Every structure is written in C-alpha cells, then in structure tokens.
Regions:
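Alpha-helical segment of the N-proximal tetratricopeptide repeat
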Residues: 3-33, 39, 46-50
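Helix-start (N-cap) detector for alpha-helical repeat units in TPR-like alpha-solenoids
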Residues: 3-5, 38-39, 72-73, 106-107, ...
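Position-specific recognition of the canonical hydrophobic site in helix A of tetratricopeptide repeat
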Residues: 15, 42, 49, 76, ...
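Conserved structural position within tetratricopeptide repeats
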Residues: 29-32, 62-66, 96-100, 133-134
Length: 167
C-alpha cells in the first residue's frame, strides 16, 4: 500500500491528467488516514473548485483554516471560490487576511483587485494591480486587468458628462 505522501502525489498527478473525480477519492483516502492533512484539504478544495463545486471547496478551505488559521493558500483559494459565487466582499476579506500575514503577496493583491473591480471600485482595483506589479513586474493577471480597469475608468468618465447633459 502506498504511503500518505505518495497518495498525495498520485492525486496531484491525476489532477494534472484531468482525472479530478478519481483525484478526489485519493484526497479522501489521505484525509481518512490523516484527518488533519492541510495539503490534502486545500488540494481537494482546488479540485472541487475546478469541477465547479465552489461551496464544497470553501468547506475544505474552512477545514484547513480551522487547523491553521493563517494558511495563505487556504485564504486565497477560499477568496477565489467566494469571488466565483459573487460574494465579492467576503472574497476581499479573505485576501485582506492573507495580505496582513504576507503584505507582498502579488496573487492576493491581484485577486483583491479583481474583486474590487467587480463591485465598481476601479481606482482601488488599479492600486491593487499596481502593488502586485511592483512585486512581480510580469504578473499577467495584474497587468491585463489593470489595462481593463483603466479602460473602464476612462470610458466611465467619458459617459458621465453626457449623462449629466441629458438630465
């Protein structure tokens, strides 16, 4: 029988091959043998998220956070799942918790920027993208979304005078 670390490795490989349902069975087996295995919890959550099962993924991240409340991967992945469910404020809370622990976490900054953009706070979103780009100049997610946010901001300011004239 394989050891728990090789089961984790197998599950990861299955995910790489797109065999997510089978990977979930492996993660469950790891967690049956080692109920506090945070890596298995988080990877199971990521796999569930990939399958579109965001609420179940959030439960996995919450389980990991119950054991290790400052786990950056669990916080950012939970934020990502909440974002996908349209719970932008809750997602922002997760990213802010991660940033309190690791202020120069480019991914958390970029994801926070995405969530801020979703609720219309484009200037704040751009600040987050800029901060992420200061840490990682080639971070495509931050660069691409900064460009989109700037364009939206520009178009939004062009529309305002026209709307005021009609009123």
């Amino acid at each position: 029988m394989m050891g728990k670390s090789s089961l984790l490795d197998e599950a990861y490989e299955l995910c790489e091959e797109g065999k997510y349902t089978l990977a979930l069975e492996y993660y469950d087996l790891v967690l049956f043998k080692d109920p506090k295995n945070i890596t298995a919890m988080i990877n199971k959550g990521v796999t569930l998220q990939t399958l579109g099962k965001h609420s179940k993924a959030i439960k996995c991240y919450d389980d990991a956070l119950a054991i290790e409340k400052n786990n950056l991967d669990a916080l950012v992945n939970k934020g990502s799942a909440l974002h996908t469910l349209g719970k932008y404020h809750d997602a922002i809370d997760c990213y802010e918790k991660a940033l309190k622990i690791q202020p120069k976490y480019a991914m958390a900054l970029a994801y926070k920027g995405l969530a801020l953009g979703e609720i219309g706070l484009l200037k704040d979103a751009i600040k987050c993208f800029n901060a992420a780009l200061k840490i990682d100049k080639k971070f495509d997610l931050a660069l691409d979304n900064k460009t989109i946010a700037l364009e939206l901001l520009k178009n939004n300011t062009k529309l305002k005078p026209k709307l005021l004239k009609k009123g």
